[in-house]
Swiss-Prot record:
The keyword Cell inner membrane applies. It is found in: Cell inner membrane. It comes from the Bacteria. It is a multi-pass membrane protein. It comes from Shigella sonnei (strain Ss046). This is Cation/acetate symporter ActP. One of its GO terms (molecular function) is glycolate transmembrane transporter activity. GO terms for biological process: plasma membrane acetate transport; sodium ion transport.
Length: 549
């Protein structure tokens, strides 16, 4: 039976995202037993790790940050595993398959945010915080308001990501494995809850590390086989691809994805600063022992991800040659079976046969599990640590805080499953773009200015943060993706697809204006505390260190 996957085009603008979704109507496929067996091996192995981790999780520090005992190299792999999703793998290779060189340019947008994290954020974040980025933002500002804002920003980003990820998981698994959509969503939700509930950050970290190794191995093998086919010559690779692609030499020309400079700038800023405001990524810097290891984490993560994106570029061009030119992978209408996002999966079959196809399918599923586990832990910590322990019940014991965290994991898991089922046939591609815009417009400005600007006050952070968050949401709703494609209006009120340029500007201006005009005694006290914060951020004096179990 031929595979039919329609309506994938709508997801391509965000397909390269680290947590994007595969959306559209999917026809259920014959059961892929090789893929299911390989995935079951992965599940059994990772559940064994979760059991091992559960024996070591004795405290709040163990649960949230694995006791701070993850090394820089391990954390770098885990960050890469958290950031590289199934849609990142399938989406970027699909963009290269359809658009050529533009696919590489688009993928770089997700990479350029990491030098910002390396040079501006990683060390100071580790020296100032313990469990969440709200620890840093509220270091010298009023705990209650800042933690509520930070938690809201985190939970909105996590919720949008989780919905996109769960729907993407259901669609992808239905396509690759032949499993029922609802079964797939429930399976992902249950496994996600088990990893986080029992193993905490330690189990989540190792699931992400294993997934990163498997994905990098699979992508490396595919790229190697493609290069072997062309005699390890990039000249031959590009020449053969241009010879068979419908666009010919145009696939080597940039500029086809984004139509105007404003959209290009807004997209770039959203990707760059959004990465530096993602709660599940920032949380990973508290799992290492000190600022030096945090810096090494970013160094290794950037290397792994840069290597991965180079591989997807080769895989995309390989798919043009070995898949696009092969009628075996086309339907009766001449379109790629399963849609363009299946280009890498078909290439896996072309270079490694059915067994390797099963392996890549299992890796795609494992990838989803690793990402949703990190998201769930970030959401749970925002509720239990930021809201419960520091706002609603100050002085709560570690045991009470952990209990609230685990209850939150269960609630988030159930909500994710329910929303995954409800959004089955909805266009959810915009959710990822909105999550990035909110992270860039609310979380990032507050984190950056709280660490670097001595005149920041609680009033400025609150007004600017809320303005950035609301502006991002409103402009996204009024833009072409939601206002026209989803709500059905003829013309968008806000003409640009990506709101980040405007919402980030509003956030920074709001923070500056309301801080500069804050003449209160509280504001003066917060400015005076900057020097002590600066010393702590540079030296790490007083920071909670990793400890041996």
């Amino acid at each position: 039976m031929k595979r039919v996957l329609t309506a994938l085009a709508a997801t391509l603008p965000f397909a390269a995202n680290a947590a994007d979704a595969i959306s559209g109507a999917v026809e259920r496929q014959p059961t892929n037993w090789q893929a299911i067996i390989m995935f079951l091996i992965f599940v059994v192995f990772t559940l064994g790790i979760t059991y091992w981790a559960s024996k070591l999780v004795r405290s709040r520090s163990d649960y949230y940050t694995a006791g701070g005992n993850i090394t820089g190299f391990q954390n770098g792999l885990a960050i890469a595993g958290d950031y590289m999703s199934a849609a990142s793998f399938l989406g970027i290779s699909a963009l290269v398959f359809t658009s050529g060189y533009d696919g590489l340019i688009y993928s770089l947008g997700f990479l350029v945010g990491w030098p910002i994290i390396l040079f501006l954020i990683a060390e100071r974040l580790r020296n100032l915080g313990r469990y969440t980025f709200a620890d840093v933002a509220s270091y010298r500002l009023k705990q209650g308001p800042i933690r509520i804002l930070s938690a809201c920003g985190s939970l909105v980003v996590v919720a949008l990501y989780l919905i996109a990820q769960m729907v993407g998981a259901g669609k992808l698994i239905e396509l690759l494995f032949g499993l029922n959509y609802h079964i797939a969503v429930v399976l992902v939700g249950v496994l996600m809850m088990m990893y986080v509930l029992f193993g905490g950050m330690l189990a989540t970290t190792w699931v992400q590390i294993i997934k990163a190794v498997l994905l990098l191995f699979g992508a490396s093998f595919m790229a190697f086989m493609v290069m072997k086919h062309v005699g390890f010559s990039f000249n031959n690779l590009f020449s053969e691809a241009m010879a068979v692609h419908p666009k010919g030499v145009d696939i080597m020309k940039p500029g086809g994805l984004v139509k105007d400079p404003i959209s290009a700038l807004s997209l770039g800023l959203g990707l760059m600063f959004g990465t530096a405001g993602l709660p599940h990524i920032l949380m990973r810097f508290f799992t290492v022992s000190d600022a030096r290891e945090a810096r090494k984490s970013v160094f290794y993560a950037t290397g792994f991800m840069g290597y991965f994106y180079i591989l997807t570029f080769i895989i995309g061009f390989g798919a043009i040659m070995l898949v696009g030119a092969n009628p075996e992978y086309k339907d009766a209408a001449g379109h790629l079976i399963g849609g363009n996002n299946m280009a890498a999966v078909h290439l896996a079959n072309a270079v490694g046969g059915n067994l390797f196809l099963g392996f890549i399918s299992a890796v795609a599923f494992a990838t989803i599990l690793a990402v949703v586990a990190g998201l769930t832990l970030a959401g749970a910590s925002a509720v239990s640590h930021d809201l419960y322990a520091n706002v609603f019940k100050k002085g709560a014991t570690e045991r009470e805080e952990l209990r609230v965290s685990k209850i939150t994991v269960l609630i988030l898991g159930v909500i994710a499953i329910i929303l995954g089922v409800l959004f089955e046939n909805q266009n959810i591609a915009f959710m990822v773009g909105l999550a990035f815009a909110i992270a860039a417009s609310c979380n990032f400005p507050i984190i950056l200015l709280s660490m670097y600007w001595s005149k920041l006050t609680t009033r400025g952070a609150m007004m600017g943060g809320w303005l950035g968050l609301i502006t991002a949401v409103v402009l996204m709703i009024l833009g072409p993706t939601i206002w026209v494609q989803i709500l059905g209006h003829e013309k968008a009120i806000f003409p640009y697809e990506y709101p980040a340029l405007f919402s980030i500007t509003v956030a920074f201006l709001g923070i500056w204006f309301f801080s500069a005009t804050d003449n209160s005694a509280e504001g003066a006290r917060e400015r005076e505390l900057f020097r002590a914060q600066f010393i702590r951020s540079q030296t790490g004096f007083g920071v909670e260190q990793g400890r041996a179990h």
